[in-house]
């Protein structure tokens, strides 16, 4: 599967993990969005169901075992290079998730992982669709 300059869009999942008025974000260790804070998540594997992928990605990136609940949104993430070619194209399916076990630990693609309260989010320069889905998650609690 070619992530950079793909021939077709890739399907990804996001796990919006909210607990005690805080949300889990990971600092990406690899492109795209390397060194930026983001929702835990990643690309589906062949034969994997979207909720299974959300569970796997949350565990891989945060050390937490989660239970995916409500679908919060489906978003397009298209990033272009300097020549305006599509460098990355993802269709992202984001679920509100509840932690059922585990301790927060950066793993896999995450350089860092931590809990954030709402008031900290504006300073992180998150993408507008990322902020939107996090707001939706907070509104459901």
Where are these regions (language model features)?
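Acidic, metal-coordinating catalytic segment for phosphate/diphosphate chemistry
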Residues: 1-14, 85
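Short, basic and Ser/Thr-rich N-terminal targeting/leader segments
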Residues: 9-12, 91, 109
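A structural signal for short, well-ordered beta-strand segments
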Residues: 15, 71, 95-97
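A cytosolic small-molecule/anion-sensing beta-strand core signal
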Residues: 19
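Conserved Nudix-box catalytic region and its N-terminal flanking loop in Nudix hydrolases
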Residues: 22-60
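A short coil-to-beta-strand element that immediately follows conserved catalytic motifs
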Residues: 65-74
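Active-site-adjacent beta-strand/loop module that shapes the phosphate/pyrophosphate-binding cleft
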Residues: 76-103
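NUDIX/MutT-family hydrolases
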Residues: 94, 105-137
């Amino acid at each position: 599967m070619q992530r950079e300059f793909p021939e077709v869009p890739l399907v990804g999942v996001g796990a919006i993990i909210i607990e005690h008025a805080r949300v889990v974000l990971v600092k990406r260790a690899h492109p795209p969005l390397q060194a930026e804070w983001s929702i835990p998540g990643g690309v589906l594997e062949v034969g994997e169901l979207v909720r299974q992928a959300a569970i796997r990605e949350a565990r891989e990136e945060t050390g937490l075992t989660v239970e995916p609940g409500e679908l919060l949104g489906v978003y397009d993430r298209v990033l272009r290079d300097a020549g305006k070619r599509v460098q990355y194209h993802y269709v992202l399916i984001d679920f509100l998730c509840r932690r059922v076990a585990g301790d927060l630990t950066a793993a896999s693609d995450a350089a860092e992982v931590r809990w954030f309260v709402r008031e900290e989010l504006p300073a992180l320069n998150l993408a507008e669709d990322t902020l939107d889905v996090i707001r939706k998650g907070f509104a459901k609690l």
